[in-house]
UniProtKB/Swiss-Prot annotation:
Its main location: secreted. It comes from Conus striatus. Disulfide bonds join C49-C80, C50-C89, C57-C72, C90-C118, C96-C113. Residues 1-18 form the signal peptide. The lineage of its organism: Eukaryota, Metazoa, Spiralia, Lophotrochozoa, Mollusca. This is Con-ikot-ikot. One of its GO terms (cellular component) is extracellular region. Keywords: Disulfide bond, Ion channel impairing toxin, Ionotropic glutamate receptor inhibitor, Neurotoxin, Postsynaptic neurotoxin, Secreted, Signal, Toxin.
Length: 123
């Protein structure tokens, strides 16, 4: 009987301590919005950010640019924001780069594709 009383008392103390800790911890509303962190987003700024970030990322993969377009596009979407999960930051640019970029031809492909419409809802 003493063992059961001891266990009950121990559990009661643990619950009280847990409730006190949880109650005293300030809950913060996380600001996860990339749009708010980066300032007001508009189509032109998002496109410029996206194309610049993809280009910078692909420069790290010299000679293998054609293999890393999708990877770099996803990385840019995380950095620049996206209109939705499907479109990303500039879908038209990604599709153009996939078609045009060849190993060691990044600057020409970037120049050719950066003027392509993104296909975004407000582009």
């Amino acid at each position: 009987m003493a063992m059961n009383m001891s266990m009950t008392l121990c559990m009661f103390v643990m619950v009280v301590v847990a409730a006190t800790v949880i109650d005293s911890t300030q809950l913060q509303e996380p600001d996860l919005s990339r749009m708010r962190r980066s300032g007001p987003a508009d189509c032109c700024r998002m496109k410029e950010c996206c194309t610049d970030r993809v280009n910078e990322c692909l420069q790290r993969y010299s000679g293998r640019e054609d293999k890393f377009v999708s990877f770099c596009y996803q990385e840019a979407t995380v950095t620049c924001g996206s209109f939705n999960e499907i479109v990303g930051c500039c879908y038209g640019y990604q599709m153009c780069m996939i078609r045009v970029v060849k190993p060691n031809s990044l600057s020409g492909a970037h120049e050719a594709c950066k003027t392509v419409s993104c296909g975004n809802p407000c582009a």
